């Protein structure tokens, strides 16, 4: 699941679907991303570090708390954060948190995000293969 700015959502979704053999859900709002994460099982979460009302790290934390308290307990998938302020101390500190698998700085080449995704999700293949 990808949650970020609407224009970037469209570009990222199209690139992921075209490049990888995977299903991609997108969300224009963190509240909707939260609802999706409760309804479906995901192999990976990709959230913007800075979103309205709640940041990507807090959204990830909240999803994890809910997953720990539902029966049967669900394992939270790894998170890749996208950030326009990747050099900030808080963004760098988040990389040390359990489950945070990477940080991609904006602006970014889609290939950089694809590489991070492949490293996080075993079995994701290039569609060209």
Predicted segments, located by residue:
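Two-component/phosphorelay signaling modules centered on CheY-like receiver
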Residues: 6-25
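Helix N-cap/capping motif at the beta->alpha junctions
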Residues: 26-35, 56
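Short amphipathic alpha-helix used as the core "switch/output" element in two-component signaling
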Residues: 35, 57-74
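Active-site residues of response regulator receiver
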Residues: 48
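Receiver (REC) domain active-site loop signature in two-component systems and cognate sites
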Residues: 51
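Alpha4 helix (beta4-alpha4-beta5 surface) of REC/receiver domains from two-component response regulators
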Residues: 58, 74-75, 86-103, 111, ...
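Hydrophobic/aromatic residues positioned on beta-strands within the core alpha/beta folds
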Residues: 82-83
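A Lys-centered signature of the CheY-like receiver
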Residues: 106
């Amino acid at each position: 699941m990808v949650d970020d700015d609407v224009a970037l959502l469209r570009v990222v979704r199209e690139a992921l679907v075209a490049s990888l053999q995977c299903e991609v859900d997108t969300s224009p709002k963190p509240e909707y991303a939260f609802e999706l994460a409760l309804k479906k099982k995901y192999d990976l979460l990709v959230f913007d570090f800075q979103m309205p009302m709640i940041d990507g790290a807090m959204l990830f934390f909240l999803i994890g708390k809910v997953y720990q308290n539902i029966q049967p307990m669900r394992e939270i998938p790894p998170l890749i954060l996208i950030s326009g302020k990747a050099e900030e101390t808080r963004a760098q500190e988040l990389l040390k948190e359990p489950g945070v698998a990477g940080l991609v700085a904006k602006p970014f080449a889609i290939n950089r995000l694809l590489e991070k995704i492949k490293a996080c999700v075993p079995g994701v293949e290039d569609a060209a293969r």
